[in-house]
């Protein structure tokens, strides 16, 4: 296996004011046999506050071992909660899809078999890019003629709606505290599905206590109404954030910690006095206390879930059917 990492934005392209040196990047896990393979691009969740390592490398490696070339996107998040993200994460993901597709020969990828795989708020990001890919302007001539449309989406306990079943923290980090009605509708993705929306695989648990299961039902229903191919799996029980739901996941074996890079850059900027926002000592202390809780190796309080843990196999079979692999 070859592991690669590179920024998705070139010098001067990324202007997010609270990056503090961080630039969104892709981490790739590639087979080296030169065989052309399908691709899964993983988008971790974290309420648009962080990109959680619990839904990153371990998921990419699972699909790698199923025969895919895989990537993880570490994208722009809103750790301080002072500037709404708006479309920046969506632009990050669109650029990532374009890069992977444009380098399909280099990475031995089937250019028409690229799936995005998002969890929770990462599922919202994945679905928003999947319904709005035509709206995302690309100014770099290297990628401006490359499609940002995924060939399929895997949506894992996704945030979908800005309506009654929304996840308020995700929407606030994305749109701020006073979004317009148009912004809320644009990011209420069940209202944005068209016949051109990529085929979608959804899964969630009935007992999800953070993102109500109605979110996945809303998107599945919109797919059905618009003639979009989809699969929808609802498992009987389990909390939010199950990721792979395996024993190793439950033991806190999440792999590398690179998706927490924005956390480190932000804390360092605050300590150095270079952050462009006032941060109280109490907030800094809270951040420093919270950071270790997201580190790989820290045991998760949840239990493995055998019922849910089959979802990657279901998704793999579904992708093979969609793409006639």
What residues fall within each predicted segment?
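C-terminal catalytic histidine-bearing segment of alpha/beta-hydrolase fold enzymes
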Residues: 83, 217-220, 224-325
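Short alpha-helix in the alpha/beta-hydrolase fold that links the catalytic acid
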Residues: 55, 189, 212-225
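Short beta-strand element of the alpha/beta-hydrolase
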Residues: 37-45
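Catalytic nucleophile-loop/oxyanion-hole region of alpha/beta-hydrolase
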Residues: 52-53, 58, 73-111, 306
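Acidic catalytic loop of the alpha/beta-hydrolase fold
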Residues: 162, 207-211, 241
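Primarily recognizes the serine-hydrolase "nucleophile elbow" in alpha/beta-hydrolase
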Residues: 95-170, 180, 184-185, 189
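Short beta-strand/loop motif that positions the catalytic acidic residue
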Residues: 196, 201-204, 208
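N-terminal cap/lid segment of alpha/beta-hydrolase-fold proteins
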Residues: 1-34, 164-168
